[in-house]
């Protein structure tokens, strides 16, 4: 991970308490979780809960079962069901033009699903909002988007894993402009920007491990390396990284003809 350390125990704090097995299953997308793991859904709630406890997504308390912030962030059916992580949902804003002057109608929305269970759909939705062109190849009409989906996927996955969870009022924001995509991440980097590709510094490691195991982000240290590979293959300008007072922005720019 490349961003400064957040509050260490945030992911172990409780997002919801006093639940029974039915309550846990109602709040977490357990079917989606088992699908991502390519395993059949157990036949009983007790077995499902046991698996969740084993990953520390759920803990057993005297007053019942408790979903941890880790469990909610990764597997929530709706992040908005949990006060502690509701603001951690990814916000997507699509602008008309190259400035913030005009938001396209209906194009300011929040991805309310947990990071793992909603990730593929979220990447697809963001990619679909990027500029595209059509051309005929071998008598077939093909649509080509301005940015490789794999680069967007890696940058977004990195942003989720490396956000500063102690910044309670904000989460990751994706801004799509006509000429660029900006992914804004709460938190500042520990590493110098020019060492993002070559080095790795751990942060939110249990969240990162949970998301890696479910295919949301690349193996440790390879994510931004992969971004460079994908954007070079598409002849895009190098990505940029801008540091604000309490946030980090990664910018992916469109192809510019020489």
Over which residues does each language-model region extend?
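Glycine-rich ATP-binding loops of the HATPase_c
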Residues: 235-242
């Amino acid at each position: 991970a490349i961003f400064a350390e957040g509050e260490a125990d945030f992911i172990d704090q409780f997002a919801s308490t006093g639940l029974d097995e039915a309550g846990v299953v109602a709040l977490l997308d357990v079917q989606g979780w088992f699908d991502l793991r390519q395993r059949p859904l157990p036949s009983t709630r007790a077995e499902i809960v046991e698996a969740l406890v084993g990953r520390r997504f759920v803990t057993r308390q005297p007053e019942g079962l408790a979903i941890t912030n880790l469990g909610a962030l990764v597997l929530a059916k709706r992040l908005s069901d949990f006060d502690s992580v509701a603001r951690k949902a990814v916000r997507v804003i699509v602008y008309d033009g190259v400035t913030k002057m005009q938001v396209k109608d209906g194009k300011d929305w929040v991805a309310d699903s947990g990071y793992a269970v909603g990730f593929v759909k979220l990447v697809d939705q963001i990619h679909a909002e990027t500029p595209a062109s059509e051309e005929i190849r071998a008598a077939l009409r093909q649509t080509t988007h301005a940015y490789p989906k794999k680069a967007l996927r890696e940058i977004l996955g990195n942003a989720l894993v490396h956000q500063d969870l102690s910044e309670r009022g904000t989460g990751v924001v994706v801004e799509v402009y006509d000429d660029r995509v900006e992914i804004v991440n709460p938190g500042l980097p520990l590493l110098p920007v020019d060492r993002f590709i070559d080095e790795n510094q751990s942060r939110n490691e249990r969240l990162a491990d949970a998301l890696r195991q479910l295919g949301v982000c690349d193996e440790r240290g390879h994510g931004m390396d992969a971004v460079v590979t994908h954007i070079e293959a598409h002849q895009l300008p190098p990505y940029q990284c801008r540091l604000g007072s309490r946030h980090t922005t990664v910018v992916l720019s469109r192809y510019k003809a020489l």
